[in-house]
Amino acid sequence: QASVSIDAKFKAHGKKYLGTIGDQYTLTKNTKNPAIIKADFGQLTPENSMKWDATEPNRGQFTFSGSDYLVNFAQSNGKLIRGHTLVWHSQLPGWVSSITDKNTLISVLKNHITTVMTRYKGKIYAWDVLNEIFNEDGSLRNSVFYNVIGEDYVRIAFETARSVDPNAKLYINDYNLDSAGYSKVNGMVSHVKKWLAAGIPIDGIGSQTHLGAGAGSAVAGALNALASAGTKEIAITELDIAGASSTDYVNVVNACLNQAKCVGITVWGVADPDSWRSSSSPLLFDGNYNPKAAYNAIANAL
C-alpha cells in the first residue's frame, strides 16, 4: 500500500470518505488489492454484486452471496458502503425489461428495492436508488421503467427506499455530469429541483466522473452546478481519468474539497489491470499495485 492514506487526509478536511470499489473476485484474487483498500481507502462500492442481474436474476428469487461478501468485508474493516444500484436500465434481467403491465412493474420495482435494502438496512451509508436515467440532452431515458410506468417511477423508487431505510442517504447517479452548462447537467438540476419541490426524498446527486484526459479542470464548475439543485449532498461516485495525470486527479479532489455539499469521492477501481477501461490506465495504482504519481500528488495536495 501507499505510505500515507489519502482517505485519512481527505477526512481531515471534514469529508466523509475517499473510497473505491470491490467485489469478491477483486478482494480475493491477490493479497495486494485488499491490503491497499484496508490501508488507503475509507469506503467501498460493490462493482457488480448489488446490480439487479446479480441480486434478483429470476422474479422473486434473490441471491446475495456476492453482495454479502462485499458488505461483510467492508463492515469488518470499518469502511462505509455505497449501495449500487437499485434501479438501472442496464444489467437488468430480461424478465424485468419484458414487463409491459404498469401495475406489475410497479410491484416488481417496490419488491426489489424493499428486499435488497431490507437485507442491508443500517449497514449502507448511501444508495444509488436510480442510475443513469437521463439522456445526453437532459431528457429522461426511455427505459422499461419510464416507458411502462412514466416519470412517476422516480417518486415510487425514492419513496419506497426512504420507507425501508430512513437513515440511508438516497442518491440519483449519472455520468457525463462533468461540465457546467452541459445539457445533461442542466437536465439533472432542473428535474431534481422539481422532484424536491414535489416532496420526493432525494438526498444526493452522484456524478460518476468517468473522465477523459484533461477534463479534470471542469469538474469544480460542474459540482457547483449540481449543488444548486438543492439536495443535501453530492458525491463523486465512479472516478477514473484516462492517463491518470496528477493535474487531473488533483483538480477533481480539490473540486470536491471546495464544494461544501460534496461528501466524498469513490475511485472506480484500485489498480489499472482491474479497471473497466484498463487500456487507458485511469486509476491510482499501477499493474504492480504500486501508487502512481497521481496518488502521491493527491496526498501532497491534501
Swiss-Prot record:
Domain of life per record: Eukaryota
Protein location: Secreted
Reactions listed under catalytic activity: Endohydrolysis of (1->4)-beta-D-xylosidic linkages in xylans
Pfam families, alphabetized: Glyco_hydro_10
GO molecular function: endo-1,4-beta-xylanase activity
Subunit structure, as described in the record: Monomer.
Protein name according to UniProt: Endo-1,4-beta-xylanase
